[in-house]
């Protein structure tokens, strides 16, 4: 489905830049016949979305999301973790879910948006302002060890190569991998 060209989501224009034109990007949507995942046909350079603009979505600003994340984290702790296990979140945003592991576990977040990571760091959540790459996964494994739990929330929609992304986990995983996504697996 071709929906034309649009400015990036979350790229609000300041008053001083109102006369400047927003860059436009193609919005063409496709669906995988096999798994039914809906995704963009043209990939926008991730730097355009996460590095060149102030990313505006903060998980901590979403009403009741922390309650959901607490329930989710409590379930993971009960079923899979022992004290001091390493927990890694990819696309951790400002650390809302990681805060529920902070007391008894070694935690690390990875998120490419620097302004979001600054908020996580202010909350005492160790977070790397990076894209999750093969190089970074090896670095984390070397410096932090293997993760007992790796998870992400609503990140799949932001990936341009899911298979390549998932391959990076082989360097890090020592336990469970969780991915919270918004598509029906039926």
Residue ranges and their predicted role:
Residues 1-63:
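N-terminal juxtadomain amphipathic helix
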Residues 8, 177-186:
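Short, glycine-/aromatic-enriched active-site segment of Class I SAM-dependent methyltransferases
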Residues 83-93:
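Conserved class I S-adenosyl-L-methionine
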Residues 94-105:
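Conserved SAM-binding loop of SAM-dependent methyltransferases across substrates and taxa
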Residues 113-115:
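Conserved SAM/SAH-binding beta-strand->alpha-helix loop
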Residues 123-139:
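Conserved SAM-binding strand-loop segment of SAM-dependent methyltransferases
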Residues 148-151:
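A conserved beta-strand element that flanks and buttresses the S-adenosyl-L-methionine
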Residues 163-178:
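A short glycine-rich, Lys/Arg-flanked "PGG" loop and its adjoining helix->strand segment in the class I
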